[in-house]
Amino acid sequence: MTAEQPTGELSLRIERRRDANGGDSSSVATSQFHRGALRVLRPYYADDSGQATYTVINPGGAYFGGDTYQLTLDVADNAALRVTTQSATKVSKTPQGPAHQTMHITLGESARLDYVPDQLIVYENGSYRQDTTVDMQPSSSLTMSEIITPGWSPSGERFTYTELRMRTEIRVCSELFAIDQLRILPAEESVTGIGFMEGFTHIGQLIFVSRMVAQPAVADALAELVRTSDTHSGLTHAGRPLPLIDDAPVCLVVRSLAHSTEAIARLHEQATDIVKDA
């Protein structure tokens, strides 16, 4: 691919529309574009809420050195979108330089996005960078899930990849609200011991930004779930005050360490259900 054209590109705009007979409304794609090594499957609706679920696929099977991927998700007023993947995202050896994914998300008034991909697996000598920006409204709701797994290596060691960098910037009405950063550099420092992985192998992070998580009952239910889960997890209140924005959303973050993808995925699913049912 040339410098001007990414390895894979995907753009979706989701709007709320009534059916042809004027019945119940659903969220549908009014604009869709893909090119290169990214595709989406036909959407489906898991329940009667009208939220559309799109599954992103990478026909190439993995991210390689120097690959660049660009995703743009635009969810209009009152629309709801869930984005997942067909399988784990795998980052192979990257001698040509890091694989890099950028994602820009725009959420309208009362719009909702659940971004819940399968796990990210970074293999030996792999390097991966991810930059996400979110522009949302006070009434929008955002859920973002990530599970990071070290890939297999011939030596049997767990952390043989070169680097992992993930940055998420969230703005409300263009005002900076929160920045989340994760940086793991096994090639430069030990990450297995006390103060980092604590002997665990898998990392999870789950970000909620919504007025719903401001409800004490929701926060208490999340705290109890985290406390009793079979992961080593914590619940954090994040985001800076936005005094000029009436009824601003609240940000809660669940961070986890575990010995398996399944343990974190189970926690994320249960936590997401608590917020969705609020």
Question: What are the language-model segments listed below?
Answer:
Residues 112-113, 140-142:
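Repeated loop/turn-to-beta-strand initiation elements of outer-membrane beta-barrel proteins
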Residues 125-126, 131-133, 144-147:
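Basic (Lys/Arg-enriched) interaction patch that binds polyanionic ligands
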Residues 148-278:
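A structural signal for small-residue-enriched, beta-sheet-centric alpha/beta enzyme cores
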Residues 39-42, 92-98, 125-127, 153-157, ...:
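A short, polar/proline- and glycine-enriched secondary-structure boundary/capping micro-motif
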Residues 118-120, 145-150:
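Short, surface-exposed recognition loops or helix-turn segments adjacent to catalytic cores
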Residues 1-119, 124, 131:
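N-terminal, charged/glycine-rich beta-strand/loop interface patches
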